[in-house]
């Protein structure tokens, strides 16, 4: 068992996390960020924090007692090597709230008008898969597209949250691939079937806490070829606007994810493909595309 004195931090403009292990807790009192991971070891799912090539596991979940800046995370005293665990979806979302046409470039490539208010839809929790899991294309599929996106992970229950308080409700950020069947989307006139198939919501590889979401570079690669590239500064509706808007419609629960929309460059995937969503300061979400057996 490895119990480090201090986790490596990266600087941020805000007062965020202290990683010193004091009485089995990590206290959020200094600048820096924290990488939270969910993983499987010996048939059990656990949450932990990453330090180098090791994971220090948590007692319970990162949502337990989360109250925004100033919260702490309780450790259970165990440490594991990254190589010996399997990474899981980084949280258990009750729902994923997706955004359509939230990049000007994507609205232009699809020949839709810029929306006056956020265009939202729901992806079910049964669509969620984790890093290195398989995206399974349905038997009848005609065109299934990748959509690389920034995901916002809610840290606590949010209802009618004003924009200037929205940051206090965010646990962190992750990568999302909003997989979509284009013909079903066109035929139905609404998006539930097109975006709701099992495995159509890859998320991961972990949750990066307290980074600034307003100028992150997001890229999508298909078979190592760059297909999408943009900055979150180009979002039509920013992260805190979205939290305020969505929480005024529905209650967001701890672990829920807001998928903030995809930039231009969407395109089809086929069995045998490998798709990667990369966001600087977060990491890479990789998945393998297969046909339904």
Which residue stretches match the model-derived regions?
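Structural signature of FAD isoalloxazine-binding scaffolds in flavoprotein oxidoreductases
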Residues: 113-131, 146, 276-281
């Amino acid at each position: 068992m490895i119990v480090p004195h201090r986790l490596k931090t990266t600087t941020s403009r805000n007062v965020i996390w202290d990683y010193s292990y004091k009485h089995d807790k990590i206290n959020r009192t200094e600048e820096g960020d924290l990488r939270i991971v969910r993983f499987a070891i010996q048939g059990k799912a656990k949450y932990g924090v990453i330090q180098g090539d090791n994971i220090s596991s948590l007692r319970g979940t990162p949502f337990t007692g989360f109250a925004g800046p100033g919260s702490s995370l309780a450790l259970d005293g165990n440490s594991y090597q990254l190589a010996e665990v399997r990474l899981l979806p980084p949280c258990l979302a009750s729902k994923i709230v997706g955004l359509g046409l939230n990049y000007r470039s994507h609205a232009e490539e699809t020949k839709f008008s810029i929306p006056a208010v956020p265009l939202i839809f729901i992806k079910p929790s049964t669509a969620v898969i984790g890093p290195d899991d398989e995206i399974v294309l349905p038997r009848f599929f005609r065109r299934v597209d990748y959509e690389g996106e920034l995901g916002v992970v809610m840290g606590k229950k949010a209802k009618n949250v004003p924009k200037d308080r929205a940051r206090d409700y965010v646990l962190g950020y992750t990568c999302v691939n909003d997989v979509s069947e284009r013909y079903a989307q066109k035929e139905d006139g609404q998006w539930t079937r097109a975006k709701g198939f099992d495995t159509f919501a890859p998320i991961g590889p972990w949750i990066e806490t307290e980074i600034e979401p307003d100028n992150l570079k997001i890229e999508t690669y298909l078979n190592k070829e760059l297909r999408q590239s943009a900055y979150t500064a180009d979002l039509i509706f920013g992260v805190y606007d979205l939290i305020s808007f969505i929480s005024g419609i529905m209650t967001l629960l701890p672990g829920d994810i807001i998928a903030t929309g995809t930039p231009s460059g969407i395109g089809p995937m086929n069995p045998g493909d490998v798709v990667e969503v990369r966001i600087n300061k977060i990491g890479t979400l990789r998945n393998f595309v297969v046909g339904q057996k």
